[in-house]
Swiss-Prot record:
It comes from the Eukaryota. GO terms for biological process: anterior/posterior pattern specification; BMP signaling pathway; bone trabecula formation; canonical Wnt signaling pathway; cellular response to BMP stimulus; cellular response to estradiol stimulus; cellular response to estrogen stimulus; cellular response to hypoxia. This is Secreted frizzled-related protein 1. Soluble frizzled-related proteins (sFRPS) function as modulators of Wnt signaling through direct interaction with Wnts. They have a role in regulating cell growth and differentiation in specific cell types. SFRP1 decreases intracellular beta-catenin levels. Has antiproliferative effects on vascular cells, in vitro and in vivo, and can induce, in vivo, an angiogenic response. In vascular cell cycle, delays the G1 phase and entry into the S phase. In kidney development, inhibits tubule formation and bud growth in metanephroi. Inhibits WNT1/WNT4-mediated TCF-dependent transcription. It comes from Rattus norvegicus (Rat). One of its GO terms (cellular component) is cytosol. Glycans are attached at N38. Belongs to the secreted frizzled-related protein (sFRP) family. Residues 1-34 form the FZ domain. Transmembrane segments: none annotated. Keywords: Developmental protein, Differentiation, Disulfide bond, Glycoprotein, Secreted, Wnt signaling pathway. Disulfide bonds join C51-C121, C68-C123.
Length: 158
């Protein structure tokens, strides 16, 4: 369960809870029977799934929900996106803070965001960097993790 859930949790800045770490339980003592080796594996969806922070519709309810759940929010232009250690590293060009949260003003100048475990999943918002974006996220340890990204549309008053 951990192996399938933890990567999705990390996209949003959460790690596997300490209380569920396997080494706290006696080995072989599980309440759910293990799947026999000859059982057929559940079919997995075909194709590459979109990074969860990128898989959202531009609806005001979704934006407000992300904003409330995030520690920080910025309007920004993106200079570049790189792959680094299995993550997508997002380097801002210009940024305007909307909600600073844990970001200190002096850190804002050198701010770099990470899409945790996002190196190989598509994020269509990042295909064209000429737009402004609404970026939301949270700080985990010393990294600022992107938890939602929306194209900033000046014309859409919603």
């Amino acid at each position: 369960v951990r192996d399938s859930c933890e990567p999705v949790m990390q996209f949003f800045g959460f790690y596997w809870p300490e209380m569920l770490k396997c080494d706290k339980f006696p080995e072989g003592d599980v309440c759910i029977a293990m799947t026999p080796p000859n059982a057929t594996e559940a079919s997995k969806p075909q194709g590459t799934t979109v990074c969860p922070p990128c898989d959202n519709e531009l609806k005001s309810e979704a934006i407000i929900e992300h904003l409330c759940a995030s520690e920080f929010a910025l309007r920004m232009k993106i200079k570049e996106v790189k792959k680094e250690n299995g993550d997508k590293k997002i380097v801002p060009k210009k940024k305007k803070p909307l909600k600073l949260g844990p970001i200190k003003k002096k850190e804002l100048k050198r701010l770099v965001l990470f899409l945790k475990n996002g190196a190989d999943c598509p994020c269509h918002q990042l295909d064209n960097l000429s737009h402004n974006f609404l970026i939301m996220g949270r700080k985990v340890k010393s990294q600022y993790l992107l938890t939602a990204i929306h194209k900033w549309d000046k014309k859409n008053k919603e």
